[in-house]
């Protein structure tokens, strides 16, 4: 059951949670971690800029509120490839909302947790696998370690962002951030394959999971030979490697680079701390440089509490959770009733290529190709 009025967590606490997420004083992420492409626990205390103006004054989100969902009751073992700094507050909110709900979270990289579940076999305690990209979800499903999600969960999200075995809970778009003192948007190529001939200074983060997923998409669309030629081309042109994509975006804003390849939210985080920074977002069109990837969740096939696992995943698609992803992590919500934060195109307005994002699970061949070209991964 939920807490009653005397317990102090009612509709008013839901409003406080949403206000805390949407207000200009909300925590701002200013850094990122390594290989899975997940931002890290580095809050910014700088003034709120472009994104802050988008966060302030947002109306109540649409979608299904948690009050209309089944209560969460019982013990849930969550294996999370998402950083605790990003999702810990949301999980704590659900924990506080339901007094009979006890979540236990094991954090780690998504790929490591896939291997852990596989190694644990039928004795795995994991109920839910929650991770930062579709590749990890696809890998677990391909190993036969997931179970079919409820029809309600599947119908909540557009079919391109889920299968019957896993569902996306938030999304991110690949972009080309550029320095506005050096280039105008019209001068940035809209074809990702044109960048080996780009005259400006480029940057990327090839050890980063999102960058490797982008390169995997190029292998799928263009073939291995063309991808090898592209990789060799940008390396020969002097592309500068960075440890993560926030550093790429920051270097562009600082004038150290002219353009680069990152997820959309890194530009927004730079602008959130420095609203006048000379950085803007450009998009390529319908190619590997324009893929849209998702964080998402699956119920493990041997889940000790599969019904609770299904209900928990449904809560990740609630109005409150989707608003949280929009205003706290600057991701794209995946239910149509909640809009992204800031001056961003909607998911429907993005010119993304049509393909099965679960194919991004085959990253090993991409890493081998990048290393063969001489790129450190």
Spans of features found by a protein language model:
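Periplasmic-binding protein-like
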Residues: 159, 172, 231-234, 241-242, ...
